[in-house]
């Protein structure tokens, strides 16, 4: 029998009140705040038709966070080209960065999770925390407006923004991809050099990234490591897109075509 912790015994209203206290704001609609804290596994287990999971709010919150972070990066780095700003934003708004912010609130103990998710350590999973954080920002936007959401970005993303603005926030995309691929797909990324071009002192390497049996991304770089990091970054972004809007089987899943 699983022993319940203090976090598991909290009522829904207590969770919302604690969230309000930690964020320093009040939600005009408690049900919206509670939705942000509700994982899909909890809804599946309770089978309450009135209960909603946080996936739609996560979808909205992703855009809210990206907008606010983009605005702050433009203000911090005047004159920086669009491509560089995009790369900087990706070093802030990713599963690792979002989970880091969620832990500073902290958010994990407030989440409503199914028993299976609880037993597998869901309160500390980067994927669960990152999704919940975006859902909270979606709820803040709906109930308090964009200004309130931007104020929270200024407070909680300040360290990450400082790091990338000063050039320190270079994330290891290969490690992040390895963790995500193992957690979500039970697959191990594999890299292989497809081609080398250019003179010996200035070679360009093209690397292909495989997930399962699928060639998932290609990227180039001045070194194998640089090319692998770029391929891993592109794959991470695609996996996040697929998770937000699943329209096909996960990459690496064997295809079973129906005979004509």
UniProtKB/Swiss-Prot annotation:
Main location group: cytoplasm
InterPro entries in the cross-refs: dsRBD_dom, RNase_III, RNase_III_dom, RNase_III_sf
E.C. designation(s): 3.1.26.3
Source species of the chain: Myxococcus xanthus (strain DK1622)
Functional description taken from the UniProt entry: Digests double-stranded RNA. Involved in the processing of primary rRNA transcript to yield the immediate precursors to the large and small rRNAs (23S and 16S). Processes some mRNAs, and tRNAs when they are encoded in the rRNA operon. Processes pre-crRNA and tracrRNA of type II CRISPR loci if present in the organism.
Catalysed transformations (reactions): Endonucleolytic cleavage to 5'-phosphomonoester
Compartments reported by the entry: Cytoplasm
GO biological process, one term: regulation of gene expression
Recorded family membership: Belongs to the ribonuclease III family.
Residues bound to Mg(2+): 58, 131, 134
PROSITE patterns for the chain: DS_RBD, RNASE_3_1, RNASE_3_2
Residue ranges of domain RNase III in the record: 16-145
Name of the protein: Ribonuclease 3
CDD domains attached to this UniProt entry: DSRM_RNAse_III_family, RIBOc
């Amino acid at each position: 029998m699983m022993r319940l912790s203090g976090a598991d015994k909290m009522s829904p209203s207590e969770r919302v009140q604690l969230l309000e206290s930690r964020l320093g704001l009040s939600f005009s609609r408690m049900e919206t705040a509670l939705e942000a804290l509700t994982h899909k596994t909890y809804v599946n287990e309770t089978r309450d038709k009135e209960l909603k999971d946080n996936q739609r709010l996560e979808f909205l919150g992703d855009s809210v966070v990206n907008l606010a972070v983009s605005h702050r990066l433009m203000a911090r780095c005047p004159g920086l080209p669009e491509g560089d700003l995009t790369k900087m934003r990706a070093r802030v708004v990713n599963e690792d960065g979002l989970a880091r912010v969620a832990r500073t609130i902290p958010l994990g103990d407030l989440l409503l999770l199914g028993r299976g998710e609880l037993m597998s350590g869901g309160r500390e999973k980067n994927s669960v925390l990152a999704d919940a954080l975006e859902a909270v920002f979606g709820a803040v936007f709906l109930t308090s407006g964009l200004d309130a959401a931007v104020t929270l970005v200024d407070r909680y993303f300040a360290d990450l923004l400082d790091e990338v603005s000063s050039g320190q926030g270079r994330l290891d995309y290969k490690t992040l991809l390895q963790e995500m691929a193992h957690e979500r797909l039970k697959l191990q990324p594999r890299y292989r050099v497809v081609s080398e071009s250019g003179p010996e002192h200035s070679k360009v390497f093209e690397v292909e990234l495989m997930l399962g049996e699928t060639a998932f991304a290609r990227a180039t770089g001045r070194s194998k490591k640089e090319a692998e990091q770029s391929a891993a970054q592109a794959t991470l972004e695609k996996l996040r897109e697929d998770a937000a809007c699943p329209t096909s089987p996960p990459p690496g899943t064997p295809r079973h075509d129906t005979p004509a």
